[in-house]
Regions:
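An N-terminal-biased, well-structured beta-alpha scaffold segment characteristic
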Residues: 1-31, 138, 158, 164
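A short helix->loop->beta-strand "cap" motif at the edges of active sites that frequently abuts
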Residues: 2-7, 26-28, 107-108, 167-169, ...
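Redox-cofactor binding/interface segments in oxidoreductases and associated redox assembly factors
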Residues: 10, 144-145, 173, 221
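Short beta->alpha connector loops at strand-helix junctions that form conserved
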Residues: 11-12, 28-39, 133, 175, ...
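Short glycine-/small-residue-rich Rossmann-like dinucleotide-binding loops
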Residues: 13, 141, 147-149, 175-176, ...
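Phosphate-binding beta-alpha-beta segment of Rossmann-like dinucleotide-binding domains, i.e.
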Residues: 26, 34-85, 97-101, 105
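Rossmann-like dinucleotide/phosphate-binding beta-alpha-beta segment
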Residues: 74-167
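Rossmann-like dinucleotide-binding domain for NAD(H)/NADP(H)
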Residues: 168-258
Length: 258
């Protein structure tokens, strides 16, 4: 029906809400801003790691309510990020930037699984590439998910490979809801086969108390705020307008998806 549609601009990275096949068939270019929010999302991921490794949100919530019977309560004992082995599911811009922060700031060992990244590329990033996802999970203290939601990544993390996580491992998903099977994650956290997890993306958004994950004290939720910083929003706005104008003016778009 949009017979005069000339271009679709995505204010962000993920294009799972756009019918790319239809756009391609109709010859409508789709552009996005893949680099504008990289730093903001990477920083949130590190923040979530710090939160769940040190029980920050749990301590805050309980301190505002019933409180604790002593200082430094034993049940709130956390773990350090320093020196941990971090598994990167996906080695794109966000994942690499997050890895850079962890490597420089916490002396982390970086490992990665990404079928679209060669060993040579991974080596140049300072990341040990794994060809098998489960083997990487078995070696990881912390696992971060940074992949788009596609038919091949839907339920990429589910009961089958959650069993390969270390019992004391933590999981972060700030990518897309649906990449991690939420029911399977709930069971792993409930039965403590996984230490803790944090998600910034859910199947149903924004997240609410209807989601069983919200009943767990070893789970932290944020309402898809990865790119929600003043700096990233400004960059995304400027870049998407620039790219749309490039297409309309017959120029080459730098970040064309289709």
């Amino acid at each position: 029906r949009a017979v005069n549609l000339k271009v679709i601009g995505k204010h962000g990275v993920g294009c799972n809400t756009i019918d790319l096949a239809a756009a391609k068939e109709l010859g409508v270019p789709v552009i996005n801003t893949p680099f504008a929010n990289t730093n903001s999302v990477a920083e949130l991921i590190v923040g979530l790691m710090l939160d769940i490794s040190r029980n920050i949100s749990v301590c805050d919530k309980k301190s505002r309510g019933e409180g604790f019977s002593c200082i430094a309560p034993p049940e709130m004992t956390g773990i350090e990020l320093t020196g941990k082995a971090v598994g990167l599911v996906g080695m794109g811009n966000i994942s690499r930037r997050m890895g850079e922060i962890l490597k420089n700031g916490f002396n982390a060992k970086l490992m990665g699984y990404d079928p679209y990244c060669s060993k040579e590329q991974a080596d140049s990033y300072g990341i040990e590439k794994f060809e098998d996802l489960n083997r990487m999970l078995e070696a990881s203290d912390i696992v971060n998910i940074s992949v788009p939601l596609t038919p091949s990544t839907e339920n990429l993390i589910s009961s089958g490979n959650l069993n390969h996580f270390k019992k004391n491992a933590i999981l972060i998903n700030a990518a897309r809801g649906g990449v991690v099977n939420e029911e399977d994650l709930y069971q792993a956290l409930k039965h403590r086969t996984l230490r803790a997890a944090a998600c910034d993306a859910f199947v149903e958004e924004p997240p609410s108390g209807k989601n069983k994950l919200m009943t767990l004290d070893n789970f932290c939720a944020t309402p898809h705020i990865g790119a929600n910083t003043e700096e990233a929003l400004y960059r995304m706005g400027m870049e998407v307008v620039e790219e749309v104008l490039n297409v309309i003016d017959g120029k080459q778009a730098k970040n064309r998806v289709v």
